[in-house]
Structure formats: C-alpha cells, structure tokens
Amino acid sequence: MQIRDWMTTDVVTATPETSMLKVSKMMKEYNIRRVPVVDPSHHVIGIISDRDVKDASPSKATTLDMHELYYLLSEVKARDIMTPNPVTVNLRDTVERVALLILERGIGGLPVVDDDGLLVGIITDHDLFKILVEVSGVRKGGVQMAVAFRDGVGVLLPLFDLLRAHNASLVSMLTADSRLGPDMREVYLRISPMERSEENRLIEEVRARFHMLYWVRENVHEV
C-alpha cells in the first residue's frame, strides 16, 4: 500500500511570515496538531506542532495584559518556532515504511512530497489507525481467530481447506512474528459473520487440528 492512497491531501499550511497567532487559530479551526511551513514554490521548509506553539506561548502566570499578549503573539512568526528541514516522505512510499518512521522517530505525522519535493499531502498517526481499520475489515464484524504455525511453505493450506469446507468467507489476513519462538508465525484471520452452529463447529475443528491462540466474536455496532 502506498501512502498516496491514504494521505490527507487538503493540507493546511503556513508561510515563514505567518504569525504564531494565526497558526494557533488554524490548528483550533481545523482540529489539527501540525502545520507544514512552505516557501512560495510549495517546498516544505519547516513544520510546526501544537507543542511548538505551546512552548512559544507566554505562561498563564504572565503579567502581560490582553493587548500586550495579542501583540506578542502577532509578532512571533512561523519561522521563529518551526522545526526546519523536517523529515518528509514520498507519495509512493509504502504505508509500512511510513509507520516505521513515525514509530522510530516518535513523531505524530509527516509531510508528503512528490518527486519534485513539492508538498502534496500529510500522513498522521490518526491516518494509520484508519488504515488498520480498513485493511483489517473490522467494520464487517464477524470473528477474528489467531493461529500459530511453524514457519514454512504451504503450512496454511490445510487451514484454508477447512475454512472452505465450512463455507467461511475470509475478510482479511495478517501475520506477525510469534512470541512462541523464532521459527513460529502468528496468523490473524477475520471471517465474515456465520450461522452460529456452523461457526461453533469450525471453532472446534480449528482447535483440534491447529494451535489456535484465540477466537473473538466482535460486535462493531457497540463501538
């Protein structure tokens, strides 16, 4: 998956001369936590987070009156509080690479640029949660089961055959390294809602033939 299919393209931006007061207002108006700073050609030259605005704002214990505060906030510019030369990602980068960057760098979002370095979007940790929801198919409800397998070629075929025998419709499948050992994999399967008696028979067969870690029936209507 490439981030160009998941990023937010309607990006709120600032220029180096935008006042901190305006940046703060934009964050509140659009309910966002970061604003890229761009030059006249739309290259990303910085980024401002809500933390940057908070750190640069006067303390609540200040003795300044309202007019003095307004003047101060109007005089501080984006260039004064932005993080210059921020990390950016290309619109063709994979979702997985971007998620790794966000995790390893401890940041909440990244500007997305095209091959010419021009800002075309932004991808945030919130977007990554939306991607997980869509890719996992959790909105469809049904059940999720986790099964551990010894890593190898064709090890999932017997399980797929069993699902087919019970007319189980597979919505999504994810895999991950297992805590059971370096040669083990955990497979997470989401299955469309089934008639309860057939579902119970499938559960019993999976338990009998495979190392089933869990089986969860989810009601997304309660969310």
Where are these regions (language model features)?
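Tandem CBS (Bateman) regulatory domains
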Residues: M1-D10, D50-V87, T94, A99-L103, ...
